[in-house]
């Protein structure tokens, strides 16, 4: 059983339309997949509307997978994150992901911090290096942190795993899928987690228990 809460479609910079993304996820035995296209002030309404249409149509025919309507707030001014996350939720987004301070992109400093203080943010994606204050906020607001299979972003997976362990943060293994070959099955997800240094118990929580906990919010 596989869960992926961070993927992209042609609605932003991905290669697949929603139907093909979901079909390929079904082949890889996914139980749930979130469509979280890149969003800012200009397009979040359109993304939520389109993704909701896709979800409603697909669930008429495929009842073996849960499609989740989401957005990834990407490279927006850090101070705007809490307000934008609330707007997205109010408009119908089921989860809000924030594009964290990955070391391979010029994400503005304090993005992680402002994501961590928002009650409407669900996942901090590829966060890079997380400081103590941010980690404490993530814990307090019950925000999940991402361990990623995506090349480049995954450079700091080990650091993220250690911070999560130290502060009791909940981790998810996501793909940040943009192309068909980015999706992974459960066995490969296990390798990503073990490679990040997760223990067997932490891996079980990350692959099964924490995803189910997140699904209960939706």
From Swiss-Prot:
InterPro entries linked: PHP_dom, PHP_phosphatase, Pol/His_phosphatase_N, Pol/histidinol_Pase-like
Entry-linked SUPFAM superfamilies: PHP domain-like (SSF89550)
Molecular function in Gene Ontology: 5'-3' DNA exonuclease activity; 5'-3' RNA exonuclease activity
Superkingdom of source: Archaea
Pfam families in the record: PHP
NCBIfam families: PRK06361.1
Name assigned to this protein: Uncharacterized protein MJ1295
């Amino acid at each position: 059983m596989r869960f992926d809460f961070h993927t992209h479609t042609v609605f932003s910079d991905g290669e697949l339309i929603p139907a093909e993304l979901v079909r390929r996820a079904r082949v890889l035995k996914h139980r749930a997949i979130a469509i979280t296209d890149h969003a800012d002030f200009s397009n979040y309404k359109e993304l939520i509307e389109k993704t909701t249409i896709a979800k409603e149509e697909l669930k008429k025919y495929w009842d073996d997978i849960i499609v989740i309507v989401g957005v990834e707030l990407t490279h927006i001014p850090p101070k705007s994150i809490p307000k934008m996350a609330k707007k997205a939720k109010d408009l119908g987004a089921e989860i809000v992901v924030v594009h964290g301070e990955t070391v391979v992109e010029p994400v503005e400093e304090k993005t992680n911090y402002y994501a961590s203080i928002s009650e409407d943010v669900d996942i901090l994606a590829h966060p890079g290096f997380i400081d103590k204050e941010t980690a404490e906020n993530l814990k307090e607001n019950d925000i999940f942190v991402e361990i990623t299979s995506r090349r480049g972003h995954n450079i700091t997976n080990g650091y993220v795993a250690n911070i999560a362990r130290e502060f009791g943060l909940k981790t998810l293994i996501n793909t940040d899928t943009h192309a068909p070959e980015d999706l992974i099955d459960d066995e490969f997800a296990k390798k990503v987690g073990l490679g990040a240094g997760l223990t067997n118990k932490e891996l079980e929580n990350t692959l099964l228990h924490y995803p189910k906990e997140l699904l209960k919010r939706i």
